[in-house]
Every structure is written in structure tokens, then in C-alpha cells.
Curated annotation (Swiss-Prot):
Protein name: Guanine nucleotide-binding protein alpha-10 subunit
Regions that span the bilayer: none
Region described as G2 motif: spans on this chain: 182-190
Record region (G4 motif): 274-281
S-palmitoyl cysteine-type lipidated residues: C4
Stretches for region G3 motif: 205-214
Annotated function: Guanine nucleotide-binding proteins (G proteins) are involved as modulators or transducers in various transmembrane signaling systems.
InterPro entries given in the database record: Gprotein_alpha_su, GproteinA_insert, P-loop_NTPase
Family per record: Belongs to the G-alpha family.
An annotated GO BP: adenylate cyclase-modulating G protein-coupled receptor signaling pathway
Organism name: Caenorhabditis briggsae
Location of region: G5 motif: 333-337
Recorded name of the encoding gene: gpa-10
């Protein structure tokens, strides 16, 4: 019953609708109580796990038709966006200075002041205003900063930086309200364990998001019992990048090793296994100029997104314990795209369906 692939063809959508109707019918029998489902969300750092969690919340909010983020939560998101702009600006300027890119001393001093003003906005809970916003726009568009942004993979600057800089005119407004797309672009590394409970009709979905950095992983094992599904997120676009924690280790190799440890047969004997090969949009662009074989010598296909994705899917699958292969659901995703919500809808139904089978309800 395993499935692998990310394209929602007509037949797949019809099957999803059939499964959803079956689940709805089964849940009608248990109206008096919530069906509780738990999903463990794991993967290496920078893979996009927290973004997936935001999209899960967005999907369940839409399906339950119970409103969005609270006013207080949106205010927190606004401050996080400003914090991201402050951090991204600091990283870009630091790269320019350390690598002796062509920027005069006057501009360096001006942009250091700009960064301090962004910091003050964050600390004071204010908004940036027109004058500061204009300086940020000039900063973003200047040649050395653009050059530094193009080299972002070498110093762990995320692609969200460009998104927020391009949206300065909207973000600077006093009445700015973050959209769902803004929220999923926010970068805040997960430390510790974050649990989000979302309610969808008769389903209570508890999603446990565990920090992906190496020092956080020892905490995962406390959550390995009694989960209904494991959602593992790996950034397929990072096949040429190094770990933040260890510059000698390739990020894709780290993801593969971690995945095979998790699915070695000791844990999750009844849980659905779901793999998101995330950041597929960046992967499709990157393979146009960056060799897969250079970083993964075992790759023998054409240097295309199709052959590359097929190779990495096989690498993840081949190292699994045989019992898990028949329960693996693999999707190529872009967690910042609203289209991922279609996949997440399918994942939610998959988790519920597997549990209902185990309990004999369908």
C-alpha cells in the first residue's frame, strides 16, 4: 500500500476524496469523543520542519473553518519578521566585510547604523517607518549585498531573506498584517520540542515538532512510543551544502544517515512512515548549475531534477528496514507553497485511515 510521488493526478485526488468520505462516515459513529492522532515531525536542522507545521495548522484551520491566528499571535509574527530582517541584514553585511566585497566605508557605517535601528524596532516592538524602510531597500539592491545573497549557501543564509527584503514596502506599514505566506517564510530555529494540537471535526491532531540540530536529537527518543505517524522532512535542495554544526558533513548525507537510524526496525512498528523531500523548487533550480555527482559520487543519472529526485528517493527507501518500505508515503514538497496544503490534506487522511484500520473502524 506504499505510495511514492508528489503529483496529485486525477485518480489520486478521486482516491483521496473516497478515503475522506470513508473517514467522515467512520467518525460519525464516534461523535461523542475526539479521535486522537499523534504525528512526530522530525528531520535535520534547516530542512523546513517548522514550516511544514505552520502549513499543517493552516490546513486544519481551513478545513475546520474556525478562524486563523489570534491578534496577539499576528503581532508576534510581525516582530519575528522584523527580527528576521535584522538578522539577515547583519549576516549579509558581515559577509561583505569578511570577503572584502566592493563597498565603501561610508556605506558600511550607514548600514551598520541601519542594522542597529532594525534591532531597536524589534526590541521596542515598533515598526520601521518610511525612512528606515527606504534605507533597507537601498541596502538590499546594492551590488555587493546582491553578490553576498547569491553566495548564501556558503554561510547558511536562508532563501526567506530575499522574500522579506522584496516585501519591505508592505512590511513597513503600521497596519501590516502577516499573510500565511509571510508566516511560513519566518525563520526561527526549533529548540527543544514544540507540540501543536489542532482540532478538525472529530479529530485531535497532536503534532510534535522536535528540534533538528544534533544537540536536540537526544530528546526525540522520549516521543518514539505511541505515535500514529512519523513525518520525516529532508531538504532535497541541500545536496551540496554543509551542516551548520559540522562543516565537514554534507547535509543530504546527514539526512540519509538520520533517516535510516530512525527507520531501522526498532521503533514505530505500526506507525505510518511519511517522507517529505522538501524544497523541491530550489532543487529544480539548483540542478541547472550544480552537479549532483560531484557531491554524491554514486549518482549515475542525468543532472536533472527528475533523475536527481528519483535517485534520492531510492537512497532513502533502500536503507529502510523491509517492514517499513510497504508503509512509506513519499512526497516531493515545497513547504512555503500553498500547494503543499493539498499534500498535507492527504497526509492527515492517511494518518487517520491507518489508525482506523488498526482499530477496526474501517
Amino acid at each position: 500500500m506504499g505510495a511514492c510521488g508528489s503529483v496529485m493526478q486525477d485518480e489520486a485526488l478521486k482516491e483521496q476524496a473516497r478515503i475522506h468520505r470513508q473517514i467522515e462516515k467512520s467518525l460519525e459513529k464516534k461523535k461523542s469523543a475526539l479521535l486522537e492522532q499523534s504525528v512526530l515531525l522530525i528531520g535535520p536542522g534547516e530542512s523546513g520542519k517548522s514550516t511544514v507545521l505552520k502549513q499543517i495548522r493552516s490546513v486544519t484551520v481551513c478545513r475546520a473553518m474556525c478562524g486563523g491566528y489570534t491578534k496577539h499571535e499576528l503581532e508576534e509574527k510581525k516582530l519575528l519578521i522584523l527580527r528576521n530582517l535584522w538578522t539577515f541584514s547583519d549576516m549579509l553585511l558581515e559577509y561583505v566585510i569578511k570577503n572584502y566585497l566592493d563597498m565603501n566605508e561610508t556605506d558600511k557605517k550607514k548600514y551598520k547604523v541601519m542594522i542597529e535601528e532594525l534591532k531597536f524596532c524589534v526590541m521596542s516592538g515598533g515598526h520601521m517607518g518610511d525612512e528606515l524602510a527606504e534605507t533597507v531597500k537601498v541596502f538590499w539592491l546594492c551590488a555587493p549585498i546582491q553578490e553576498a545573497y547569491e553566495k548564501r549557501n556558503t554561510y547558511h543564509l536562508t532563501e526567506s531573506a530575499g522574500y522579506f527584503f522584496e516585501n519591505i514596502d508592505r512590511i513597513k506599514m503600521p497596519d501590516f498584517q502577516p499573510t500565511n505566506q509571510d508566516i511560513v517564510r519566518i525563520r526561527v530555529p526549533t529548540t527543544g520540542v514544540v507540540t501543536a494540537d489542532v482540532i478538525l471535526k472529530n479529530i485531535k491532531l497532536s503534532v510534535i515538532d522536535c528540534g533538528g540540530q544534533r544537540q536536540e536529537r537526544r530528546k526525540w527518543y522520549h516521543y518514539f512510543d505511541d505515535v500514529h505517524a512519523v513525518l520525516f522532512v529532508a531538504a532535497i535542495s541541500e545536496y551540496d551544502q554543509k551542516l551548520v554544526e559540522d562543516e565537514s558533513v554534507n547535509r543530504m548525507d546527514e539526512a540519509l544517515n538520520l533517516y535510516h537510524i530512525v527507520f531501522n526496525g526498532k521503533y514505530f512498528t505500526k506507525a505510518a512512515c511519511i517522507l517529505f523531500l522538501n524544497k523541491i523548487d530550489l532543487f529544480r533550480e539548483k540542478v541547472k548549475s550544480v552537479s549532483i555527482k560531484k557531491f554524491h559520487p554514486g549518482f549515475e543519472g542525468a543532472n536533472t531534477a527528475e533523475d536527481g529526485a528519483k535517485y534520492f528517493r531510492r537512497k532513502f527507501r533502500d536503507g529502510m528496514h523491509p517492514d517499513f518500505k510497504k508503509r512509506l508515503y513519499c512526497h516531493e514538497t515545497c513547504a512555503i507553497s500553498d500547494q503543499v496544503q493539498i499534500i498535507i490534506n492527504t497526509v492527515i487522511d492517511t494518518v487517520v485511515q491507518e489508525n482506523l484500520k488498526d482499530t477496526g473502524m474501517i
